[in-house]
Amino acid sequence: MQKLIMGNWKMNGNSTSIKELCSGISQVQYDTSRVAIAVFPSSVYVKEVISQLPEKVGVGLQNITFYDDGAYTGEISARMLEDIGCDYLLIGHSERRSLFAESDEDVFKKLNKIIDTTITPVVCIGESLDDRQSGKLKQVLATQLSLILENLSVEQLAKVVIAYEPVWAIGTGVVASLEQIQETHQFIRSLLAKVDERLAKNIKIVYGGSLKAENAKDILSLPDVDGGLIGGASLKAAEFNEIINQANKICTE
């Protein structure tokens, strides 16, 4: 399966640093039949990034509102997302859930706004360290996915990318073990198989939790890991490009 490598730039960068980053990423060579690339800059830089990256590199927003338009100061709608030419949308990132109290219902409502568009939604799910240590991992992930799996058709679900991000491994430098990553991705796929086995086989489930150049080969080689959602390492073109190179090699072997 084609690997999907995505960079979440979060609230980082300025016009100068982003221009340098885009220039660096533009140099990487990879087979587009084996690897797909996308980046998520801050919304104010999206148009700049689209113009500075090759067309083959997807660009997305980190968040939208579930309202269409109106008196919602500071918000960005799905219509605006399409209008500026975005290809992807992050939904339900752990930082949105923890810092801005986004609920599973909010995540579903945002997903529902774009599921029938050309935008590829990347739905983030993941557990806290307390959840894992108390044996609630499977319960938490199943709950986070329940509204989506119960209310979307198989055809709609096929458009979704799922990003598993253990909250305790984001921005901490702590990486889940290979066994933990594979077991969790396998469990997520089993939830999808209950809806449709072909869907479970073909949907992309990517890993997001301190993935970097030094561990990319091992993580991306796991059978149920279809790519990565990279944070800090995506802000350095050389490191992000090396992750892309590793993905390309894995899909070539």
Curated annotation (Swiss-Prot):
The name this protein carries in UniProt is Triosephosphate isomerase
Q: Which reaction does it catalyse?
A: D-glyceraldehyde 3-phosphate = dihydroxyacetone phosphate
Q: Name one GO molecular function term.
A: triose-phosphate isomerase activity
A GO term (biological process) for this protein? glycerol catabolic process
Q: Does the keyword Isomerase apply?
A: yes
The UniProt similarity line reads:
Belongs to the triosephosphate isomerase family.
Binding locations of substrate = N8, W9, K10, G171, S210, G231, G232
What this chain does, per the entry, is described as: Involved in the gluconeogenesis. Catalyzes stereospecifically the conversion of dihydroxyacetone phosphate (DHAP) to D-glyceraldehyde-3-phosphate (G3P).
* Pfam short name (any one): TIM
Which Enzyme Commission number(s) are listed? 5.3.1.1
Q: Which PANTHER family match?
A: TRIOSEPHOSPHATE ISOMERASE
- Main subcellular location: cytoplasm
The enzyme's main class, written as a single word, is isomerase
One GO cellular component from the entry? Answer: cytosol
UniProt entry keywords in alphabetical sequence: Cytoplasm, Gluconeogenesis, Glycolysis, Isomerase
Describe, as the record does, how this protein assembles with itself and its partners. Homodimer.
Report the superkingdom from the record.
Bacteria
Q: In which organism is this protein found?
A: Francisella tularensis subsp. tularensis (strain SCHU S4 / Schu 4)
